[in-house]
Amino acid sequence: NTNNTIEEQLSTLEKYSQGRLGVALINTEDNSQITYRGEERFAMASTSKVMAVAAILKESEKQAGLLDKNIIITKSDLVAYSPITEKHLATGMSLAQLSAATLQYSDNTAMNKILDYLGGPSKVTQFARSINDVTYRLDRKEPELNTAIHGDPRDTTSPIAMAKSLQALTLGDALGQSQRQQLVTWLKGNTTGDHSIKAGLPKHWIVGDKTGSGDYGTTNDIAVIWPKNHAPLILVVYFTQQEQDAKYRKDIIVKATEIVTKEFSNTSQKK
């Protein structure tokens, strides 16, 4: 049973990493799953942003022109790591621009502006419940949601819950068709993911992803993947460590990706 050997390989990787690793892969061809600590809670860090943007997209189904709505950004709004919003203090940004900045550059002020518009982090949790995700919980804004304290349930989910939600949002019918296409387009245009899941996959595969990082060396990535000649895959890799100031370990994300996707790169080469 290859599943066992995959789990054994992930366990070996985790021991080597000296951290805690969570993985969930869904093969959408038959909805089969590979998981490792798939039901355990991990701090999401910026991977939480996909659900927040999806909540805005859902609102836009009911309100024509919502994404064009201009949001004022003041100097006092700015929080650490806001490469796009800091350039738009004079003009403000539309909800569409804020969504793109949130997903493609992981701009923290943009995320906070989206949360403010929705009515706070709890509204994102409510949206998650509405798409049948009972695990996801968003409790705080940026940058506080990245504290990733061991055992703290705030701003966490499980790998399998996130994988199922990402599948519903990008490939299922949790969003209307044009909203789903917009989300996928934004994810495919991500600028932060080249050294994470993408680096563990064959070059010609198409990937849309959202990275995340936080305290305790928390290093995350969630992705929808289109292999050559194969139905899409959904992959969530969450990783966290013992020391609060531990270094990020994108190499662990890459290795975990290689382990769980190997069988698909083999089939796509054969065809």
UniProtKB/Swiss-Prot annotation:
GO terms for biological process: beta-lactam antibiotic catabolic process; response to antibiotic. It catalyses: a beta-lactam + H2O = a substituted beta-amino acid. GO terms for molecular function: beta-lactamase activity. It holds the Pfam family Beta-lactamase2. Keywords: Antibiotic resistance, Hydrolase. Disulfide bonds: none annotated. The class A beta-lactamase family has a specific amino-acid numbering system, sometimes called Ambler or ABL numbering and often misspelt as Amber. A multiple sequence alignment was used to derive a consensus sequence and then the consensus was numbered taking into account insertions and deletions. This allows use of identical numbers, e.g. for active site residues, despite differences in protein length. UniProt always uses natural numbering of residues, hence there appear to be differences in numbering between this entry and some papers. NCBIfam families: bla_class_A (NF033103). Monomer. This is Beta-lactamase.
